Amino acid sequence: MSFVLIAPEFVTAAAGDLTNLGSSISAANASAASATTQVLAAGADEVSARIAALFGGFGLEYQAISAQVAAYHQRFVQALSTGAGAYASAEAAAAEQIVLGVINAPTQALLGRPLIGDGANATTPGGAGGAGGLLFGNGGAGAAGAPGQAGGPGGPAGLWGNGGPGGAGGSGGGTGGAGGAGGWLFGVGGAGGVGGAGGGTGGAGGPGGLIWGGGGAGGVGGAGGGTGGAGGRAELLFGAGGAGGAGTDGGPGATGGTGGHGGVGGDGGWLAPGGAGGAGGQGGAGGAGSDGGALGGTGGTGGTGGAGGAGGRGALLLGAGGQGGLGGAGGQGGTGGAGGDGVLGGVGGTGGKGGVGGVAGLGGAGGAAGQLFSAGGAAGAVGVGGTGGQGGAGGAGAAGADAPASTGLTGGTGFAGGAGGVGGQGGNAIAGGINGSGGAGGTGGQGGAGGMGGSGADNASGIGADGGAGGTGGNAGAGGAGGAAGTGGTGGVVGAAGKAGIGGTGGQGGAGGAGSAGTDATATGATGGTGFSGGAGGAGGAGGNTGVGGTNGSGGQGGTGGAGGAGGAGGVGADNPTGIGGTGGTGGKGGAGGAGGQGGSSGAGGTNGSGGAGGTGGQGGAGGAGGAGADNPTGIGGAGGTGGTGGAAGAGGAGGAIGTGGTGGAVGSVGNAGIGGTGGTGGVGGAGGAGAAAAAGSSATGGAGFAGGAGGEGGAGGNSGVGGTNGSGGAGGAGGKGGTGGAGGSGADNPTGAGFAGGAGGTGGAAGAGGAGGATGTGGTGGVVGATGSAGIGGAGGRGGDGGDGASGLGLGLSGFDGGQGGQGGAGGSAGAGGINGAGGAGGNGGDGGDGATGAAGLGDNGGVGGDGGAGGAAGNGGNAGVGLTAKAGDGGAAGNGGNGGAGGAGGAGDNNFNGGQGGAGGQGGQGGLGGASTTSINANGGAGGNGGTGGKGGAGGAGTLGVGGSGGTGGDGGDAGSGGGGGFGGAAGKAGGGGNGGRGGDGGDGASGLGLGLSGFDGGQGGQGGAGGSAGAGGINGAGGAGGNGGDGGDGATGAAGLGDNGGVGGDGGAGGAAGNGGNAGVGLTAKAGDGGAAGNGGNGGAGGAGGAGDNNFNGGQGGAGGQGGQGGLGGASTTSINANGGAGGNGGTGGKGGAGGAGTLGVGGSGGTGGDGGDAGSGGGGGFGGAAGKAGGGGNGGVGGDGGEGASGLGLGLSGFDGGQGGQGGAGGSAGAGGINGAGGAGGTGGAGGDGAPATLIGGPDGGDGGQGGIGGDGGNAGFGAGVPGDGGDGGNAGFGAGVPGDGGIGGTGGAGGAGGAGADGDPSIDGGQGGAGGHGGQGGKGGLNSTGLASAASGDGGNGGAGGAGGNGGDGDGFIGGSGGTGGTGGDAGVGGLANTGGTAGNAGIGGAGGRGGDGGAGDSGALSQDGNGFAGGQGGQGGVGGNAGAGGINGAGGTGGTGGAGGDGQNGTTGVASEGGAGGQGGDGGQGGIGGAGGNAGFGAGVPGDGGIGGTGGAGGAGGAGADGDPSIDGGQGGAGGHGGQGGKGGLNSTGLASAASGDGGNGGAGGAGGNGGDGDGFIGGSGGTGGTGGDAGVGGLANTGGTAGNAGIGGAGGRGGDGGAGDSGALSQDGNGFAGGQGGQGGVGGNAGAGGINGAGGTGGTGGAGGDGQNGTTGVASEGGAGGQGGDGGQGGIGGAGGNAGFGAGVPGDGGIGGTGGAGGAGGAGADGDPSIDGGQGGAGGHGGQGGKGGLNSTGLASAASGDGGNGGAGGAGGNGGAGGLGGGGGTGGTNGNGGLGGGGGNGGAGGAGGTPTGSGTEGTGGDGGDAGAGGNGGSATGVGNGGNGGDGGNGGDGGNGAPGGFGGGAGAGGLGGSGAGGGTDGDDGNGGSPGTDGS
């Protein structure tokens, strides 16, 4: 049995920590991969490269091992996480948890603690851990603190258990939490928490148990020198005191930080020792010295170590005192800065001195002894001194200068590196301690690299110049001395001396210059010139020397030899029959490589530098190309010239010597020899001339082509030195191309007969031989023999001439003549050895046969037969292959295609009422040509046979003029196809041509229309038969039979006469479609395919029935005429073995005529619309050919659309109702389909007429206006038409024919008419309400679907019509001195039509959609107030109620309720009248806005799966009127109050569902209207300005509609926003007197209260308070007499800003309360008056104080007790007035004191002090005024009941002090005034800035 205890949450946390650790390691491995696996070599030598490769391999092995370890780590974490989950699952399933729950329940309920169990760990920052169980249980852990917050204390244990650990302190120095107390009897105290980063103190350990259990350990101090926590005390008997926490390291810095002190050990118990003190922290490291300059900076001093903690007090009886803590170690000194690179003339700077190590920390005192038998504790040991800092590295020497390019000069010497810095002194320890060791000396700087030698100059006309030598590398810097050890203690080691630097690398030698190219040959066929040699590369520079023990620099690399010049190109051969191209020139020799530089010498014990590598020899020049042979336009081409020899390669440079004086170092490697030049390419042979072409129309043979010239031989490759690579031989030249054979002449056309044959093509010329390849160079390795040149391409054979075209028929109806035969193609030319033969010429194409003539018009003569096509020409043979492996015989030529047969002539068109003529037959296609033969290669295929000619189209039948139309003519037969040509030896025979397509039968003529009003139309003519398809040759494809002609369309019936509404005429029947032609017979062979039968013609469409006549006024419309019957489809064409054609489709029945429209009512109800005509029956489908499918029957005609009902008349007089609209006409029945056809759909019912509008109201009997008339009811929609032959109710679809027919769908019921709009109420005194809107018409019933004859599914019945929309209610009249009238109620929506009944197997139609209720009318606007002292505005009218939605039929969708009307706007209050001497009139109060109308109720659902309608939306409340402005008076008057916003309308109730399921959603309530703005206060006239008026209250939101059974209640609207308070009036200026003070500004008006929301709605926001008025300016002081001038007046105080309005309260439920309004801005204080000039002068007046900011409005209260809305912010304080200027005088008066700012949101700036007066006497001096104090910030608005208090505003800035007065002549200037103090922030606001002092005055002269 296991005794291991597992805490699953700890295991899960450990798995998470391991996951993070694995991610960190993986990221570190990835970042280090590139640096560790691709190690760069320290030098260019082989040893450095091998070492780098070795360490790179180690890096790769590490990465591979890391990948395996990461995979194991991932599997381990996965197993750990899985185990934690398993333990957690086992705990959850264990019975222990259930038993503990039963045991702990009573004590948990009574005392708040369990009986058994651990306390919970805290989760919130700084939270305390939970207490353990009363009997058994450990305390929970405290949570870590937030930044700057102390960690939470650990929870206490019960009787038996350990205390919980304290939480860690937050970053920024937070103290760790104290550990929890151990159990009352047994248990260890919890450990204290770790202190937060930034020097936080660790938490104290918890006390132990009474009987047994030590105190907890103190927490470790926070990073940055935190002090450790005290250990917990032991309790009575056996527990030892806890150990103190350790201090932490001090942070780094210029001087390292002091380490943290160790914590005090805990006191022991009666029988137990005290705890040990904590160890002190290590001092921080000193900062590094700065880099750069001639001398690097000195490193910083290390920090002092922390003192160890004191041991705990010993036990009362037997325990010893605790041991003191170990002192902290001193910090390490900083590293010295690196010396700058090359700062003193190029020499590197000396490294800086290392920093001094830190002083060691003191040991902690031992713990005191106990009372009886215990001893004191030992003191802690002293810490170790810090190590001195390392000296800085010396700077690198500058590199030597590179020599200029193309000069060959030696590079400059590199500069010496700087010396390393001295190591720092070790830190001191006190007696008994250990001193710190000295720092290591710095590394010497690296010597500079030598400069690169200059490259040799290129030579455009000779040998290239040699490159210059590289410069010598610079010497390395000396290493720095080690630092001294510390003093005061024992130990400490002198620092190690620094290493010497590395000597500089020698410079690279310059590259040799390139030699110039040889001259090209100028004379025809001459040899090109030899190229020049390249220059030698320069020697590498010597490496630099190093100091003792250092590493020398490596020698420089020798320069690369210059490249040899290219040989000149040979001349081109002359243009003559024997001209040969010239030989190319020899390439120049490459330059020798430069010698490697000597390695640098080493000091004693050092490593010598390696010698430099020798330079690479230059590449030899390429040989010149041979000249091309001459072309010969009239004979054989010339041979190409031989290519030039490649140049020899340059020798490699010698390796450099090693350095002296030390060990190691390698001799430089010898340079590589250059690569020999490539031999030149042989010239191309000239092309042979082409054979002459025969003349066109001559039928002659074309001339043979001439042979091409031989290609030139390739040049030899250049020689290489020992070890070098030889040049490759040049490639041989390509042989010339043979000439093309001439084309054969074409056959002549024959205008009177058959065409002539074309001539044969000429033979192609032979190809030229390819040139031999060049030899390789000698002396080295490698090099390739040049490739033999390619033989030329044989000439192509000439193309055979085309046969001539045959003549067309010479007269009307005569046949055309045959085409001529195509000529044979010429043979291809033979290739040379290994070449490619020419292809045989293509055979000529046979001529096309002539077209037959067109038959004459009139009675319709037949067309002529087309001529046969000519045979295709035979193809030429391919050329013979040349000798060799790569030879390829030529392909045989392509055989000519046979000519196409001529097209048959078209039959003549029939005259009116006569048939058309037959089309002529097509001509036969020509035979294909024979394919060309080839000796060994691929033979050509035979030519394709010509296609047979297309048969002529039959003539079109004549159109009927007084009767039936004529039939169309029969189409001509297609021509037979030509045979395919025979293949060449091994080639495939050509494919036979395709048979010609039969001609298309002519279309039948259209029947005549009816001859008069209401008469029937005539039948259409029959379509002509299609021609038979032509037969194919052996294996060919037959032509398809011709398509039968389409039957003619029947004539349209005439339209019925207007007036009383006559019926329309019947449409004529459509003509039958023509029969299709038979397909052609298949040819002999496996691939033969018989032709398809032709497509049968479609039957003609029946004529459309005539439209019924329109009814006269108040009469019904006429019935529409029936549609004509469709024609029968044609018979499909037959085929012997292939696919037979399908029969033609029957014609569509004609569409029934539209019923006539009912007449409009003039004095009453409108007339009904006429019934629509029946649709025509469909034509039958044609029979199929042998094996073919019968044609589809046509579609039955659609029934006519019923006529629209007439519109009802409007009301006959003022205030009377309108009349009803007429009923819509019934739709016509759909036509029946033929067997298998598709029936026509029933016609749609007509739309009901719209009801008439009510008449407008009038003034009747005095001041009241008349009510508006009610709108007329809309007419019902017409029912759908009947199907064919079915009497009675319902617009049924047609029945299906026998077979797989599809019955027609029932018609759709008509839409009900829209109700008329109610009349508008008249403007009156008082105003009148608007009339009610008319109800919408009911929708028509859907038609019944057609019946299927097979007993299968019948057609779907028609949908019911939609109900008409209710009319809109009339708008209320505007008030004229009174309240506005209310809007009329919207009309009720029409009920939906019932869906059509289902037939056997069919689907019933859907019910229509109920009509939407009409919109309620808008209320009228209230009138403005009367012109009086307080003329209040009138209220707006109430919005009309929305109409009720129409009901749906069974299963339909109900109409939505109408939207309530908008309430009218309240009238504006009048401005107050101007006051008399005493007081002005007050502004009038704005009128209240009208209440929004109630939304209409939604329609109820029909029985079944109906969807009830949504309730209407309540109307929006009207806006309140604005208050009038107060008059300017004495005193001035306050502004009027704004009117209240109207209340939002209530939402409509949702429709009820008849099935008991969910009903529709109810409508949303309307939004409340916005409150009106308060009026502005009047300006003061010798008094204080008037206060602004209060803003109007926002309207309450409308209540959401009540829910029906199962439905959803509507949402409440949004409460209206409160109006803005008016602005206060401005105070008057002061009176003209000695101290005329200005008057105060008026107070801003209070913002209006926000409207309340309904249940669950959103409240309106409170209005914004008005701005306080500006204070008046003080008057200037009066001019003084001889004694004293008058003082300037004080500016008036600014008015106080208005209080923000309170936000609306939330409705019951999930409502959102409104925000409080924003307080108004305080008014600006007035400016103080200027002091008068006098003797002495008078002080300037004091500036007025700024007005206080308004208080923020209170946030709305939430009814649910949850968070309420935020309160408004306080207003900003007004700016203080400016102080007056002091008067000029004798002894200067003090400047006026700046005004004090008012309290407010953002305090205003204090006024500036006035300037001091000028001195009065030579000894006097003025005193400046003192700047005003900044205003205090206003208090923030109070928050709602659950949100707390808002922040106060910011304090204002203090005013600036006044400038001192200027002294009189001989006097002294005044002193500068002091700046004002900044205002204090209130409730969280920031204080303002103090003002600036003034400038002193200037002394007098």
From Swiss-Prot:
<feature type="compositionally biased region" description="Gly residues">
    <location>
        <begin position="1740"/>
        <end position="1758"/>
    </location>
</feature>
<feature type="region of interest" description="Disordered">
    <location>
        <begin position="1666"/>
        <end position="1700"/>
    </location>
</feature>
<feature type="compositionally biased region" description="Gly residues">
    <location>
        <begin position="1262"/>
        <end position="1288"/>
    </location>
</feature>
<dbReference type="InterPro" id="IPR000084">
    <property type="entry name" value="PE-PGRS_N"/>
</dbReference>
<feature type="region of interest" description="Disordered">
    <location>
        <begin position="915"/>
        <end position="934"/>
    </location>
</feature>
<feature type="compositionally biased region" description="Gly residues">
    <location>
        <begin position="1330"/>
        <end position="1348"/>
    </location>
</feature>
<feature type="region of interest" description="Disordered">
    <location>
        <begin position="1620"/>
        <end position="1645"/>
    </location>
</feature>
<protein>
    <recommendedName>
        <fullName>Uncharacterized PE-PGRS family protein PE_PGRS54</fullName>
    </recommendedName>
</protein>
<comment type="similarity">
    <text>Belongs to the mycobacterial PE family. PGRS subfamily.</text>
</comment>
<feature type="region of interest" description="Disordered">
    <location>
        <begin position="1461"/>
        <end position="1495"/>
    </location>
</feature>
<feature type="compositionally biased region" description="Gly residues">
    <location>
        <begin position="1116"/>
        <end position="1133"/>
    </location>
</feature>
<feature type="region of interest" description="Disordered">
    <location>
        <begin position="146"/>
        <end position="175"/>
    </location>
</feature>
<feature type="region of interest" description="Disordered">
    <location>
        <begin position="249"/>
        <end position="289"/>
    </location>
</feature>
<dbReference type="Pfam" id="PF21526">
    <property type="entry name" value="PGRS"/>
</dbReference>
<feature type="domain" description="PE">
    <location>
        <begin position="1"/>
        <end position="93"/>
    </location>
</feature>
<feature type="region of interest" description="Disordered">
    <location>
        <begin position="1116"/>
        <end position="1135"/>
    </location>
</feature>
<dbReference type="Pfam" id="PF00934">
    <property type="entry name" value="PE"/>
</dbReference>
<feature type="region of interest" description="Disordered">
    <location>
        <begin position="1415"/>
        <end position="1440"/>
    </location>
</feature>
<feature type="compositionally biased region" description="Gly residues">
    <location>
        <begin position="1535"/>
        <end position="1553"/>
    </location>
</feature>
<feature type="region of interest" description="Disordered">
    <location>
        <begin position="1254"/>
        <end position="1288"/>
    </location>
</feature>
<feature type="region of interest" description="Disordered">
    <location>
        <begin position="1519"/>
        <end position="1560"/>
    </location>
</feature>
<feature type="region of interest" description="Disordered">
    <location>
        <begin position="1311"/>
        <end position="1355"/>
    </location>
</feature>
<keyword id="KW-0677">Repeat</keyword>
<feature type="compositionally biased region" description="Gly residues">
    <location>
        <begin position="1311"/>
        <end position="1322"/>
    </location>
</feature>
<feature type="region of interest" description="Disordered">
    <location>
        <begin position="1809"/>
        <end position="1901"/>
    </location>
</feature>
<dbReference type="InterPro" id="IPR048996">
    <property type="entry name" value="PGRS_rpt"/>
</dbReference>
<feature type="region of interest" description="Disordered">
    <location>
        <begin position="1724"/>
        <end position="1761"/>
    </location>
</feature>
<feature type="compositionally biased region" description="Gly residues">
    <location>
        <begin position="915"/>
        <end position="932"/>
    </location>
</feature>
<feature type="region of interest" description="Disordered">
    <location>
        <begin position="577"/>
        <end position="626"/>
    </location>
</feature>
